[in-house]
Curated annotation (Swiss-Prot):
Belongs to the bacterial ribosomal protein bS16 family. It holds the Pfam family Ribosomal_S16. Keywords: Ribonucleoprotein, Ribosomal protein. This is Small ribosomal subunit protein bS16. It comes from Geobacillus thermodenitrificans (strain NG80-2). One of its GO terms (cellular component) is cytoplasm. It comes from the Bacteria. Disulfide bonds: none annotated. GO terms for biological process: translation. The keyword Acetylation does not apply. NCBIfam families: S16. InterPro entries: Ribosomal_bS16, Ribosomal_bS16_CS, Ribosomal_bS16_dom_sf. The gene is rpsP.
Amino acid sequence: MAVKIRLKRMGAKKNPFYRIVVADSRSPRDGRFIETIGTYNPVAEPAEIKINEELALKWLQNGAKPSDTVRSLLSKQGILEKFHNLKYGK
């Protein structure tokens, strides 16, 4: 099973709010997911990002691939750098 970390759209029309979820790559965007690891609100000024660092690192170590948008959110929070240091032992 190929697992991805991606955004699940929530909120009202013209007022998006996203949950950062771990899901099977074959399931639809807003369909079934395995676990929620955070939230992202692009409407707030500045954009509001909340990610559970421990869960994100756990799933990255288990081989979950982040989508492009989630990858940029993780790097803004410094989580990808920590994952890189854990993986390559620096």
